């Protein structure tokens, strides 16, 4: 589970000198995800949609008033109200490319590097020291990021996620229907719908296998 991998390792890094209650917040394109830690021990994970975030944060700190430190990773513009509310209850660090990170980088445009990718590479650097690591994360987009054994972030690639692939087939053609992912996928589709499912899911599977093989 990418979020938990990020949350555990990034909390261990940024909050390693304190044994208090810590909070990580992962702000995605559709959901807010929260992980509460007692020191480095995961206590609970929670989640909510964007429109519920202010109410959710208030309830979270009612349940865990001991939280003293918070780190936020956001791939979208974070509402100032949410940051202000978090700061009312804890010391907040918003992750960015200028944060003190456990790796060096050769990325040519670090200011454009998503904090979701930064967080996962930071987690990989801590979890797998002195090893070449390929980090794959699937969400709205599928990202591939490479960390070398000498702890240097080289870069990676960004590809459309599952929902984006379904939507693009529908949006850029005249007659293909808009579908949602399904659990049962045949390699060879015997109808337009099953052919779309096969193209999207098998395409992603083969893409991931190919990227792993390439690296």
Predicted feature residues:
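Conserved active-site and cofactor/substrate-binding residues in soluble primary-metabolism enzymes
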Residues: 48, 52, 112-119, 164, ...
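Adenine-nucleotide phosphate-binding core of ATP-dependent small-molecule kinases
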Residues: 46, 185-215
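Hydrophobic alpha-helical signal peptides and transmembrane signal-/tail-anchor segments
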Residues: 1-9
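N-terminal glycine/serine-rich phosphate-binding loop of ATP-dependent small-molecule kinases
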Residues: 11-101
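Acidic-glycine-rich active-site phosphate/pyrophosphate-binding loop
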Residues: 91-102, 140, 177-184
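Glycine/small-residue-rich loop that forms an oxyanion/phosphate-binding "nest" at active or ligand-binding sites
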Residues: 90-124
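Glycine-rich phosphate-binding loop plus the immediately following alpha-helix
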Residues: 115, 120-130, 154-198
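Gly/Thr-rich phosphate-binding beta-strand-loop-beta motif of the actin/hexokinase/Hsp70
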Residues: 21-38, 131-153, 169
């Amino acid at each position: 589970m990418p979020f938990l991998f990020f949350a555990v390792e990034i909390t261990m890094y940024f909050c390693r000198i304190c044994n208090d209650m810590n909070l990580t917040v992962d702000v995605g394109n559709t959901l807010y995800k929260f992980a509460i830690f007692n020191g480095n021990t995961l206590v609970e994970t929670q989640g909510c949609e964007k429109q519920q975030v202010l109410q959710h944060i208030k309830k979270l700190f009612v349940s865990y008033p001991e939280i003293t430190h918070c780190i936020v990773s956001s791939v979208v513009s974070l509402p100032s109200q949410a940051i202000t509310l978090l700061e009312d209850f804890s010391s907040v660090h918003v992750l960015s490319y200028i944060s003190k990170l456990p790796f060096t980088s050769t990325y040519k445009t670090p200011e454009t590097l998503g904090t979701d990718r930064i967080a996962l590479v930071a987690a990989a650097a801590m979890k797998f020291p002195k090893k070449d690591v390929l980090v794959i994360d699937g969400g709205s987009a599928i990202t591939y990021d490479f960390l070398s054994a000498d702890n240097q972030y080289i870069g990676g690639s960004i590809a459309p996620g599952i929902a984006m692939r379904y939507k693009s087939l529908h949006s850029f053609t005249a007659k293909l229907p808009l579908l949602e992912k399904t659990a049962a996928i045949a390699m060879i589709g015997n109808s337009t719908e099953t052919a779309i499912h096969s193209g999207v899911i098998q395409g992603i599977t083969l893409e991931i296998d190919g990227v792993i093989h390439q690296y």
